[in-house]
Design a protein with these regions (language model features):
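Glycine-rich segments within core transmembrane alpha-helices of 12-TM secondary carriers
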Residues: 149-173, 194-195, 383-393
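Helix-breaking motifs and short loop linkers at transmembrane-helix boundaries and internal kinks
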Residues: 56, 88, 109-115, 126, ...
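Conserved MFS/SLC helix-loop-helix module at the cytosolic interface between two early adjacent transmembrane helices
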Residues: 75-114
Length: 441
């Protein structure tokens, strides 16, 4: 996270100093938690390169099992976010971190298809609520004008994890035979330790609400709360949703479909990227490093695109272009094939950049619509159902790969999904009054 990322426009000193202090206090802490979460996403693909051989898993078994994480995630997502809204982020996020850390480490001891399946379900149950909880938490601290840029910075932790995770995972695979364990077992055991540590850090350092922030001056607390209250009043004057209305309004379901299109294509690509890179003829020792390159490109793209969207006060076409880049990058991979590995890697960089740019922009739309309990439940609903795409994408890719033996056909199935997501997003639309509210700051 660079200093330039936190540079604020020419504004009143109280606003500039308050936002800067809140950002530097909260965002690094949340980023570390999200970094830990994404170690699983980055390393489950690395583990697959040897785990599937040692446990005699097919691509379909691995893809199905990897995606079962999102079944557990789906089942507990809404209750988890409602609990967070009730008891506070500090205690609940700390609980999430320690339980998923323990279960992530236990993945190193699965021995069969069914033990792998159940482990992934319980891991999803444990982690449920972290990401939508942070989306909700951002609305408690950041005015809408700043929210997308800081969501982009927060979410860049996932890209950093996907960038550094594969090389670290590749090194851990070389521990094969140490203490009688396979390399993939060491990979899973070690990835569970950081979230356990972060549990205690979060419990001590995270602050629930601005009124609890002893690290802000009285003047800063007063200004921030007044600004947030003013935005809440403006938003509710457009329309105030109850929890039930948030679950039933057609726009929320269209947004859920849009998010599903991104997650299904994105997770399918992420989980199987090490195997795609291996198919380009990359030596085993270099797979982790080469797999990390698209995420380095995505890191730069998502921070710039989130900042640009906030700066110009526009969401919809920033989002649609990101969906198009994601689908287009995969389409180029299909057309080029494995015969031109450099061009294929460039296309993968574009696809991953498009995928990673979507989420921080996307969440600005429901968080601008909803308030209070409706925000807690509605954001969790979109994330819970949308993230079932994390089950569909890897499963679809694995099944198609086993059935046809073709990477191109498998990628084609994934590329269609963000196209459908973009269509759903455009049908849902975005209230221009919320855009004007952002531009007024």
């Amino acid at each position: 996270m660079s200093a330039t990322a936190f540079t604020l426009e020419k504004i009143e000193p109280i606003e500039r100093e308050t936002i800067k202090r809140v950002a530097w206090r909260l965002i690094p802490l949340l980023m570390l938690g999200y970094f830990c979460a994404y170690l699983d996403r980055s390393n489950v693909g690395m583990a697959a390169t040897t785990m599937v051989v040692d446990l005699h898993f097919s691509n379909a078994v691995f893809g199905f099992g990897a995606g079962l994480f999102f079944l557990g995630y789906f089942l507990f997502e809404i209750p988890s976010n409602l609990i967070l809204n009730k008891i506070g982020a500090r205690r609940w996020i700390a609980r999430i971190l320690i339980t998923w850390g323990i279960i992530a480490s236990l993945t190193g001891f699965v021995w069969s298809e069914w033990s792998f399946y159940w482990n992934r379900i319980f891991l999803g149950l444990a982690e449920a609520g972290f990401y939508p909880g942070v989306v909700l938490y951002m609305t408690w601290w950041f005015p809408s004008y700043y929210r997308t840029r800081f969501m982009s910075i927060f979410q860049s932790a996932s890209v950093v994890s996907l960038f550094v995770g594969p090389p670290i995972g590749g090194l851990l695979l070389y521990m094969d035979g140490v203490a009688g364990l396979h390399g993939w077992q060491w990979l899973y055991i070690m990835e569970g330790l950081p979230p356990i540590i972060m549990c205690f850090v979060t419990y001590v350092l995270l602050t629930d609400r601005p009124k609890d922030a002893a690290w802000l001056t009285e003047e800063q607390r007063t200004w921030l709360q007044a600004r947030l209250d003013s935005e809440l009043e403006q938003r509710e004057s457009i329309r105030k949703f109850s929890l039930g209305q948030a679950f039933l309004t057609p726009k929320m379901w269209l947004l859920t479909g849009a998010y599903f299109g991104q997650t299904s294509g994105g997770y399918g690509l992420t989980f199987f990227m090490p195997l795609i890179v291996k198919g380009l003829g990359v030596p085993t020792g270099w797979i982790g490093l080469v797999t990390a390159l698209p995420f380095l490109c995505a890191f730069v793209a998502m921070i710039y695109w989130g900042w640009h969207s906030d700066r110009v006060g526009e969401r919809m076409w920033h989002l649609v272009s990101s969906y198009a880049l994601m689908a287009g990058g995969m389409a180029v991979c299909i057309v080029i094939g494995t015969g031109h590995p450099v061009i294929t890697m460039v296309a993968l960089c574009l696809a991953v950049a498009g995928n990673q740019c979507i989420s921080p922009l996307f969440w600005s739309i429901p968080s601008a619509m909803l308030t209070g309990t409706a925000a807690a439940g509605g954001i969790a609903m979109i994330n819970a159902i949308g993230n079932l795409g994390g089950w569909l994408g890897p499963s679809l890719y694995g099944v198609m790969k086993d059935a046809t033996g073709s990477t191109d056909i498998s990628l084609l199935c994934l590329a269609v999904l963000p196209v459908l997501g973009a269509i759903s997003l455009m049908v849902a639309g975005h209230d221009p009054r919320q855009e004007r509210m952002m531009r007024r700051g």
